[in-house]
């Protein structure tokens, strides 16, 4: 998605979203900025490759997008998983970042360092998503149940997620390889930690 003219702003969505998550911000921001809201690798309408979900590689995806669009420097805004990509991008390509905004995110290395039983219970899905092939098998055909959990239990005010928005995300995750793409994002966590600690 791309709208508007002016200084470029790239919006990176979180899990379990797609660029559709920015549908309310894009019209407002595009009054003054050139707004670009891609789907992250493995999410939404992107390809669903078998590998390359570490945040350094996903940051390279954003760098390539900038190259294709002829962008020299951007304001980079990331939410949740998108914040992890944005942070990695800012570390690897600081000369390309005018401003960085990260929302709803704890740094990868902190999550890994502070993981305990209490946090594991609260963030059970982080660990569930790491198991090879099982989440995909259990979620297939039940995407609406899986997504309902996140949009009900993990949302401050679940009534803000309209039926239209929910159905949009369900359709996105029913696409071939979509659940695997999201799981691969989480499965790259150990590699992300190693990159952050280097």
Where are these regions (language model features)?
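Flexible "cap/lid" subdomain of the alpha/beta-hydrolase fold that forms the substrate-access gate
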Residues: 8, 22, 36, 43-77, ...
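Conserved residues at beta->alpha junctions
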Residues: 13-16, 173
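Alpha-helical and His/Cys-centered functional microenvironments
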Residues: 17, 29, 83
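A short loop-to-beta-strand scaffold at the N-terminal edge of the catalytic core in hydrolase folds
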Residues: 1-3
């Amino acid at each position: 998605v791309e709208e508007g003219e002016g200084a470029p702003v790239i919006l990176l969505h979180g899990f379990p979203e797609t660029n559709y998550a920015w549908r309310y911000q894009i019209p407002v921001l595009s009054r003054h900025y050139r707004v670009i809201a891609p789907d992250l690798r493995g999410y939404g309408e992107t390809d669903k490759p078998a590998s390359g979900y570490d945040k350094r590689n996903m940051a390279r995806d954003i760098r390539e997008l900038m190259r294709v669009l002829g962008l020299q420097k951007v304001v980079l805004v990331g939410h949740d998983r998108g914040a992890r990509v944005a942070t990695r991008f800012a570390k690897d390509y600081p000369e390309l970042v005018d401003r960085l905004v990260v929302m709803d995110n704890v740094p990868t290395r902190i999550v890994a360092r502070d993981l305990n039983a209490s946090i594991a219970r609260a963030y059970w899905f982080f660990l569930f998503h790491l198991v090879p092939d099982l989440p995909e098998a259990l979620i297939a055909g039940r995407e609406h149940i899986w997504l309902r959990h996140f949009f009900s239990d993990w949302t401050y005010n679940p009534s803000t997620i309209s039926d239209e928005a929910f159905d949009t995300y369900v359709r996105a995750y029913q696409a071939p390889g979509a659940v695997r793409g999201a799981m691969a994002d989480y499965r790259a966590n150990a590699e992300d930690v190693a990159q952050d600690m280097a």
